[in-house]
């Protein structure tokens, strides 16, 4: 009897004690076979709670690294080892050391969209859904926010009592969403609130009705009385938006809302990774311990 890929995935989950975690930005058919789907914070938190011995991550490499850092005793497999986030590499250790020398009281606040090496040199990690809460809870006057410039600048407007030093990293997907694209969409759909991810540029945030992480955008759209929305984040979120809100309409602002790295993950690659139990995320234990501290601090401060 010929079985489908989905049936094979379910079979392998049971046979090999695998839990599948997927980010909202992967294709809808991959989200459908996942056990847990969410944003970076949700997935980092859930990775510490799952009972299965093996975690298969459908996302980009820093997400798999975070799961391994938090779960050294578990085997973490990536659906695609070449699915990487360019922004994760847009800061270097020399810059962190330079800022620490210049501002002795600085807190290095590291967005989870970063490599394990960068996390190891940071004081605390954040996601877009908990960055405000974490930064507000820090006693430090100076905040060096890495690697994303746009998210850092947005958080700085909400915490005016602190002084921010910014890095020049960015998400190529969110910075490709231009103000004129949003204004054009607003003309076409004048009754649709604009829901925007804070990795977008300030001029896009200015004309948005709501700013939040992917999970917060999903929550807002689900609870809102509005029946149509303009969505300014990666297209993968449209799958879950539609699943939870079949009676509502969601509009993009252009073809650029597409992360080629997230879209590298396919059902075929999921099956292959499960059958071969690789590519496995491995890490030097000294690095893992150093990178673990800021992640654990994030989970504590974000409660």
Question: Which positions does each model-derived feature cover?
Answer:
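Active-site loop-to-helix "anion-binding N-cap" substructures in soluble metabolic enzymes
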Residues: 1-231, 237-303
